[in-house]
């Protein structure tokens, strides 16, 4: 039994290929995969936007130092709207660097400047892709350019004046029909005899005066309106005149009753004080001065 135990002793101390040391030192073994490479360093910051000899800046560069560099690449999706000539007669084309160059000049006075869409940075390798939001933006830009180009030649100058003067003028009224003196005289005679005409009478009168039925009807309507107004004015004038006459008669009667002479009392004739009191009328408007009374001593 001892030799068997001695034979197993060295077998237990034999190194194991999958132990902790072998697992921790796995890369050192043959056939193990190499470690992944370290990540590349970040790219350097982009240079400032270049300027042309005429002082025109490139729109594709960053504005105000904002981190929006214009990446070089094709613009097949948004290059078509800018190649068309705008209302100023300038072709907006993309530069090889992927930016839009605008010449430094002032717009034509009176023209409507079209809105300049914001430049969309292109991603290398994705120039042929199309997204829904890109389609809507492209369609919106094209519609705006088309509308601006269509409205520019037909610019209407606004009138200076009151706002209501810009409205559509009212419809011109029909000129007033004029009749001859003979026609007016015959119409007046017939109106004084008869204020209202039947259809047959109106037709006969129109035929005799060489007028239309509508003209005779309109004339009689206007004449009746004038007659009613004149009659009302005459009645009002008569009523006012009658009122003034009644007031005048009442005033005269009242004054006559006040101015009637009073029969003097025989007793007052011998007494000057009583005579003065009898002749005193304080209700008169124009009272005469009372002479001084001398008392009899």
Curated annotation (Swiss-Prot):
Function: Seems to be involved in the development of cranial sensory innervation from peripheral ganglia.
InterPro entries linked: HD, HD_metazoa, Homeobox_CS, Homeodomain-like_sf, TLX1/2/3
Tissues expressed in: Expression is restricted to neurons in the peripheral and central nervous system.
Pfam families referenced in this protein's UniProt entry, alphabetically: Homeodomain (PF00046)
Compartment(s): Nucleus
Keyword Nucleus (UniProt): yes
Gene3D superfamilies with a match to the protein in the record: Homeodomain-like
Region feature Disordered, mapped onto this chain: 1-68
Organism: Gallus gallus (Chicken)
Domain of life of the source: Eukaryota
Gene Ontology biological-process annotations: animal organ development; central nervous system development; GABAergic neuron differentiation; negative regulation of neuron differentiation; neuron fate specification; neuron migration; regulation of respiratory gaseous exchange by nervous system process; regulation of transcription by RNA polymerase II
DNA-binding region: 172-231
Main location: nucleus
Keyword annotations: Developmental protein, DNA-binding, Homeobox, Nucleus
Record field: compositional bias (Pro residues): 32-52
Protein name (Swiss-Prot/TrEMBL): T-cell leukemia homeobox protein 3
Gene Ontology MF term list: DNA-binding transcription factor activity, RNA polymerase II-specific; sequence-specific double-stranded DNA binding
Gene assigned in the entry: TLX3
GO cellular component: nucleoplasm; nucleus
